[in-house]
From Swiss-Prot:
A Pfam family matched in the record: UTP25_NTPase-like
Subunit structure: Component of the ribosomal small subunit (SSU) processome composed of at least 40 protein subunits and snoRNA U3.
Taxonomic path: Eukaryota, Fungi, Dikarya, Ascomycota, Pezizomycotina
SUPFAM superfamilies in alphabetical order: P-loop containing nucleoside triphosphate hydrolases
GO molecular function: rRNA binding; U3 snoRNA binding
Basic and acidic residues bias (residue ranges): 18-27, 100-120
Name listed for the protein in its UniProt record: U3 small nucleolar RNA-associated protein 25
Region called Disordered, residue ranges: 1-170
Organism: Coccidioides posadasii (strain C735) (Valley fever fungus)
Listed Gene3D superfamilies: P-loop containing nucleotide triphosphate hydrolases
Localisation per UniProt entry: Nucleus, Nucleolus
GN (gene name): UTP25
Role, per record: DEAD-box RNA helicase-like protein required for pre-18S rRNA processing, specifically at sites A0, A1, and A2.
Amino acid composition bias (Basic residues), ranges on this chain: 1-17, 89-99
């Protein structure tokens, strides 16, 4: 199946659409560097690579290794002539002895029978690589002595042990059952002004998710290897992060809606430290259990693994964002060697464009450096090495854009899907979710819908070591989901509500808004009018909004239109959040008898740079009386439109920063700023716009504007 939303550089995918000719004008004349390691797969742009090079489980270098390894594989086959062909590929000693717990043995057999043992040649190549890697020293700290995390585990206070490693099965079963029926909700506010909505599955006993803040790294259950490096780079936890640290390190789901350019780095450090701590503890448990077998005998019960190796998935908007995350990971994880780091920097990192110095800070953070949104990367950690570009099935952490990951999961013909590497993900991080919202949110939903599904193939799994809640199909109830966004939206809330099912509970953290209307970058007061219309449901909202706009807003403007097009309606910018609404309004202006005398231009995220420049010039010079302008175009370009004397917002923007930037267009012409301020801004809204409107008018005002029955027009200056 073809994936919609092809990658782009600082902009959306440009489709070759039929040119729209009906706008009226007045009568005036990467470096495709070779793989540097046997585990690498090609992460270059699709414009430079074929689908085969984007295989999750194979690459050019992996193919070379497979060819050179054939004699060794043949020797292994000769040595295994007498082996049981129906047994698992590795660690067969467990199956030679009858399990003391017959129920669990039956459970293992049931899952094994449901997974086909046949795998294709490419997948077998990946298993060969995995076999070789097992001889390495993994990221275990068995020689480091007993650290704080070990003492916490022994004392039963380590969240990792309580949540993943050794959960109370009876309590877990009750919570899973409760999660499908009843959730309890509580709300409280922090001294910093942050609002927390906590939800947990009600299993017959009250639970408080109002956790005390963590001010010191000593309060975190970190492995000693990480505690030392964390103390160097995070000497203390700031006041804002101290309130959310207990939920991150305590394995609660969290939707954090107050991400900014100022706190982005500290939030990134926190979730990277947490992800590393989880990876190291997971691998330590496996390594230590491996050493227990010779001492305690082969009948010892050890449940310490998932179906596949990857445990952490981090979704990011751009390659440069991936570089920042990897930098954060590498400063906490001191590796003696970093394989393929040079290739990583060459293909993922770029310098900032100096011409963007006048752009807003949030724009520079998102689009600075390499802004390609088509990428994926596997990271593997051993005791002394950090490896880049490892194959997914041999990786501990997967970093990817939603588009890049989806193209790895499905083929264009739609016949083959590969998502088993997501079957054992225990921590999902979505950073800068609001930026992903401006790309193609459908890719995010697609990835979440394929998390923690039962794998279609064994992939060398030792089922005798798989945790019981994996075998029961309950991994999604223990997976931790962390979403960081600059603002909330219905789409983000939907993913959080649908896929965040952590039995420990989940918290939604939002800030209190003063309102974008109070901080406008205009030298004079601007008249701001908000018009409410009644809408019965979200499904009917687009139709209701369109009728209100054409019958009320356009009709009032039409009175000022003349045959020449020069009227008091000139200089009108119509800001439209949705591209679908943009197309509908553009077509209406081009064909309606109501707008016969109107000259207008229309620019969107799919308009060519040349056509955008022409439309802006015509609008500034008065040849266009009206200019249609989409939110996504503003997100990707941040134009400063000149000639604006009136702003009509078909809907308020998702990003509150955009409101101030759009209103600032009124002050770009000093000679006409007084007239523009008087005409001001008119924004349409319904009750379904509550989240967006709160950020624009402020938390204190939103209630009265939604519930006011005495009128539907609200004016601020």
């Amino acid at each position: 199946m073809a994936v919609k939303g092809a990658h782009a550089r600082r902009g959306p995918p440009r489709r070759k659409l039929p040119k729209f000719e009906t706008s009226r004008v007045q009568d005036l004349d990467q470096d495709n560097s070779p793989s540097e390691g046997p585990d690498a797969f090609d992460n270059e742009s699709l414009d430079e690579a074929s689908d085969a090079e984007y295989s999750v489980v194979s690459s050019d270098s992996a193919e070379e290794e497979r060819l050179t390894a054939k004699p060794y594989n043949a020797l292994l086959q000769l040595l295994n002539v007498g082996a049981d062909p129906n047994g698992p590929a590795r660690k067969k000693r467990k199956l030679k002895h009858k399990n003391k717990d017959n129920g669990k043995e039956d459970q293992v057999d049931k899952v094994k029978r449901s997974i086909p043992r046949e795998v294709d040649s490419e997948l077998q190549d990946d298993l060969d690589v995995k076999e070789a890697s097992d001889d390495e020293s993994e990221s275990g700290d068995e020689n480091d002595g007993i650290d704080e995390a070990d003492r916490d585990a022994a004392a039963g206070s380590d969240p990792f042990e309580a949540h993943f490693s050794q959960p109370d099965e009876a309590r877990l079963s009750k919570r899973i059952e409760a999660s499908t029926k009843t959730w309890q909700t509580s709300k409280h506010q922090l001294s910093s002004g942050m609002r927390i909505t906590a939800t947990y599955p009600y299993a017959g006993n009250e639970q408080s998710l109002a956790l005390p803040p963590l001010h010191s790294l000593k309060d975190l259950p970190l492995k000693r290897k990480l505690s030392e490096t964390a103390s160097e780079h995070m000497s203390q936890i700031n006041a804002q992060n101290s309130s959310i640290a207990p939920y991150i390190f305590g394995y609660y789901d969290m939707l954090y809606g107050a991400r900014t350019t100022e706190n982005a780095a500290s939030l990134r450090d926190m979730y990277c430290l947490h992800a590393l701590n989880h990876i190291i503890k997971t691998r330590d448990r496996v390594v230590k259990n491996n050493s227990r077998v010779p001492k305690e005998g082969e009948d010892v019960e050890m449940r310490d693994q998932g179906f596949t190796r990857p445990k952490v998935l981090i979704l990011l908007p751009t390659r440069q964002a991936c570089v920042r995350v990897v930098d954060s990971i590498s400063k906490f994880y001191r590796a003696d060697q970093q394989e393929n780091k040079k290739r990583f920097l060459e293909t993922f990192s770029e310098t900032d464009d100096k011409s963007w110095e006048d752009k807003p800070e949030d724009f520079q953070e998102l689009f600075g450096g390499n802004d390609d949104d088509m990428f994926r990367l596997g990271l593997k950690f051993t005791r002394k090495t950090m490896k880049y570009f490892t194959q997914f099935y041999n990786s501990d952490i997967i970093l990817a854009s939603p588009l890049g990951l989806r193209t790895a999961m499905e083929k264009e013909d739609g016949k083959k899907q590969e998502y088993d590497f997501l079957s054992s993900i225990e921590l999902v991080v979505v950073d800068h979710a609001d930026a992903l919202l401006m790309q193609n949110w459908d890719h995010v939903e697609y990835v979440f819908s394929h998390l923690n599904l039962q794998p279609k193939a064994a992939h060398g799994c030792d089922f005798s070591r798989v945790r019981t809640w994996y075998l029961d199909g309950n991994a999604k109830y223990l997976r931790q989901t962390l979403i960081f966004t600059s603002f909330m939206s219905p789409e983000i809330n939907s993913v959080y509500s649908t896929y965040a099912q952590n039995v420990s509970g989940k918290v939604k953290i939002n800030t209190t808004y003063q309102g974008a209307i109070l901080d406008l970058p205009v030298p004079v007061p601007v008249k701001q009018t908000f018009s409410r219309f009644d809408s019965l449901s979200p499904v009917k909202d687009p139709e209701t909004r369109f009728k209100y706009f054409t019958n009320t807003v356009l009709s009032s403007l039409a009175k000022n239109w003349s045959g020449s097009g020069k009227s008091s309606a000139s200089g009108t910018l119509i800001f439209i959040p949705s591209y679908l609404d943009f197309v509908r309004i553009r077509n209406y202006l081009a064909t309606s008898s109501q707008t016969t005398n109107l000259s207008f231009g229309a620019i969107s995220e799919y308009t060519s740079v040349r056509d955008v420049a022409r439309a802006r010039s015509y609008f500034m010079n008065g040849r266009h009386s009206v200019l249609l302008y989409t939110e996504r175009l503003h997100h990707f370009r941040r134009y400063k439109i000149r000639g604006v004397k009136r702003v009509i917002m078909y809907g308020v923007p998702d990003n509150p920063l955009f409101y101030g930037e759009i209103v600032a267009f009124l002050g770009l012409d000093p000679s006409a700023v007084g007239e523009a301020a008087e005409k001001g801004v008119r924004a349409l809204f319904s009750k379904w716009d509550a989240l967006k409107l709160e950020r624009v008018v402020g938390t204190k005002r939103i209630g009265s504007m939604m519930m006011e029955k005495g009128g539907d027009t609200f004016t601020f200056t």
